[in-house]
Swiss-Prot record:
Keywords: Ribonucleoprotein, Ribosomal protein, RNA-binding, rRNA-binding. It comes from the Bacteria. One of its GO terms (biological process) is translation. One of its GO terms (molecular function) is rRNA binding. This is Small ribosomal subunit protein uS15. CDD domains: Ribosomal_S15p_S13e. The gene is rpsO. Part of the 30S ribosomal subunit. Forms a bridge to the 50S subunit in the 70S ribosome, contacting the 23S rRNA. Belongs to the universal ribosomal protein uS15 family.
Length: 89
């Protein structure tokens, strides 16, 4: 199950420059992080759901690519984002 419309709107308003900024790198990474954390809870209950695990790995890979792009463009925005999201890197 994907995120609700309200949850997505809150993430966009929190991480975007305005309420309609859904395409910025920060917003995309934040949305992927929310979906990944939602799926991690799913896998705690459904350990053998390999089909969805493939989707999870795809999301993690996409988030990694976006973070690498942001790190190359603006290191300050990158460090700010990973601190706000609580990511390891």
């Amino acid at each position: 199950m994907s995120l609700s419309v309200e949850a997505k709107a809150k993430i966009v308003s929190d991480f975007g420059s305005d309420a309609k900024d859904s395409g910025s790198t920060e917003v995309q990474v934040a949305l992927l992080t929310a979906q990944i954390s939602h799926l991690q809870g799913h896998f705690a209950e459904h350990k053998k759901d390999h089909h969805s695990r493939r989707g999870l790995l795809r999301m993690v890979s996409q988030r990694r690519k976006l973070l690498d792009y942001l790190k190359g463009k603006d290191v300050a925005r990158y460090t700010s984002l990973i601190e706000r999201l609580g990511l390891r890197r």
